[in-house]
A protein has these predicted regions:
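A short glycine-rich, His/Asp/Glu-containing loop-to-beta-strand
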Residues: 100-115
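A structural signal for short, well-ordered beta-strand segments
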Residues: 111-113, 133-135, 195-199
């Protein structure tokens, strides 16, 4: 795990090699299980896709909030291994010296699996949470271009790299540029996956 700390207009973290080989094996087992149209569905306003000022849908991808699929978190490989973000009193988040990451705690979190294929993208939006942690995954060799994330109105580019995690305050505007699949091999499952963890504070539980 290689952690890079950034503290420009706002604090954020980029972590490469976030999951180890065994964790990746478990994650891919579940991603392959989920990668069917009746499981990962096209984003809609009703399913939580962000909208613009005029009500237009900003999100063009397939997605699913997987917490609602399982009665018990332990039944999901992804929901089991992604607990590492909160382990040891938020040890990973505490690597950043900024007061935001030094003090943040959650009493609620939820996880979304997203999948981007040809021409998919996500317009600039903010997340309805406190902290967003996005992990990008794709099958090697990479068979698409694009899918990079841009932070804030200054468009700070974070390249889409396999097994890279980006962690940032959820209120920071961000977007994903358009995916272009390799036309010679456009088969489903070879696009850009993203596992997004949202850490939130539910005041009703305080």
């Amino acid at each position: 795990m290689i952690i890079d700390i950034f503290n420009e207009q706002f604090p954020y973290m980029v972590i490469d090699d976030y999951y180890n080989e065994e964790e990746l094996r478990l994650i891919w087992e579940e991603l392959d299980f989920l990668s069917y149209p009746h499981k990962l569905k096209r984003a809609t306003k009703e399913s939580g896709g962000a909208t613009g000022n005029t009500g237009e849908l900003l999100k063009k991808n397939f997605h699913r909030y997987i917490d609602e699929i399982y009665c018990e978190r332990e039944m999901s490989n992804i929901l089991s291994v992604n607990r590492k973000l909160f382990s040891n009193d938020y040890e990973i988040l505490r690597q950043h010296p900024h007061w935001f990451f030094q003090n943040i705690k959650f009493n609620r979190d939820y996880t979304q699996v997203g999948y981007y294929e040809d021409n998919d993208h996500y317009g600039e939006h903010r997340d309805n949470a406190s902290v967003s942690a996005l992990t990008w995954l794709y099958k090697e060799p990479k068979k698409f271009t694009g899918g990079d994330l841009f932070l804030s109105s200054d468009k700070i580019k974070i390249d889409c790299v396999n097994n890279r995690t980006l962690i940032f305050p959820s209120m920071i505007p961000h977007s994903v540029n358009e995916i272009h699949m390799n036309k010679e091999n456009p088969s489903r499952g070879h696009g850009r996956y993203v596992i997004t963890q949202f850490g939130a504070i539910d005041t009703r539980k305080s």
